[in-house]
Amino acid sequence: MSATERQLQYLRQLVDGARRIAVLTGAGMSTESGIPDFRSADGLWSRDMSLTDAVSVDYFRRDPAAFWRAFRDIFHIKLVGDYQPNDGHRFLAALEASGKEVTILTQNIDGLHGRAGSRRVLELHGTLLTASCPDCRSPHPLDYVQRHELPACRRCGAALKPDVVLYGEAVPLIDVAFQAALNAELLLVMGSSLEVSPVNLIPVEAARAGIPCALINYTPTRFDALFDLCIQAGIGDTCRQLRA
């Protein structure tokens, strides 16, 4: 499904009329780079253990080795560096390069926004690209993590924890994200089903504050009524049409 010309015209009008733009991106942004959406019906996780248990902070603390086996399986750790930014990522980077103040609030942990050239990126759920020691806080790069079945801190030997927000942990940047959205002149949501709290409340607060909101997502969300514009289409295709 593609955006209609009327939808594209309205979206161009919203983007052109805003100097400060907040962009909330979800898994649908990265699936166009070939990264599976682990939460989808045909996603990566189909084991007996629930996803929320497998990538929970409690499971990490209880059994780091089993946690890392599940974590690698779910997030394809060995392939992370092979994925490339897509047209959606590049569109946002180009928008920033054009002089607009674009702040990306991403739920994704793949680092593709930064690799595309975006500089103002809040990784709300952390990043797969590093892991840190929970005891001495020593950081370790992805290539080190990829080489070890159970990555241990090179300084103190403790099991490393991936620098992602696990189930059971708070989202440390959530207040900053809300503030960025409320300071914007446009909130653009791309590739998010808006199922994960508290991030899904960002468009609620933005709409309540009178900020124009637009959504690009393959499927409807339960918050569609909040948006001034909803486009059910691919992100890359929509962004290519916008730049045409």
From Swiss-Prot:
Residues where NAD(+) binds: 27, 31, 38-39, 107, 109-110, 125, 192-193, 217, 235
Deacetylase sirtuin-type domain: residues covered: 1-244
Entry binding sites for Zn(2+): 133, 136, 153, 156
Localization terms from the record: Cytoplasm
Gene3D superfamilies per record: SIR2/SIRT2 'Small Domain (3.30.1600.10), TPP-binding domain (3.40.50.1220)
Enzyme Commission identifier(s): 2.3.1.286
Superkingdom, taxonomy of origin: Bacteria
Keywords (A to Z) from UniProt: Cytoplasm, Metal-binding, NAD, Transferase, Zinc
One annotated Gene Ontology cellular component of this protein: cytoplasm
InterPro entries the record matches: DHS-like_NAD/FAD-binding_dom, NAD-dep_sirtuin_deacylases, Sirtuin, Sirtuin_cat_small_dom_sf, Sirtuin_class_U, Ssirtuin_cat_dom
Catalytic reaction annotation: N(6)-acetyl-L-lysyl-[protein] + NAD(+) + H2O = 2''-O-acetyl-ADP-D-ribose + nicotinamide + L-lysyl-[protein]
Cofactor(s) needed: Zn(2+)
Cofactor note: Binds 1 zinc ion per subunit.
GO MF terms, alphabetically ordered: histone deacetylase activity, NAD-dependent; NAD+ binding; zinc ion binding
Keyword Transcription annotated: no
Catalytic residues in the record: 125
Name of one Pfam family that matches: SIR2
Residues annotated to bind nicotinamide: 38, 109-110
Role noted for this protein: NAD-dependent protein deacetylase which modulates the activities of several enzymes which are inactive in their acetylated form.
HAMAP family, alphabetized: Sirtuin_ClassU (MF_01968)
UniProt record similarity statement: Belongs to the sirtuin family. Class U subfamily.
Protein name (database record): NAD-dependent protein deacetylase
Source organism: Chromobacterium violaceum (strain ATCC 12472 / DSM 30191 / JCM 1249 / CCUG 213 / NBRC 12614 / NCIMB 9131 / NCTC 9757 / MK)
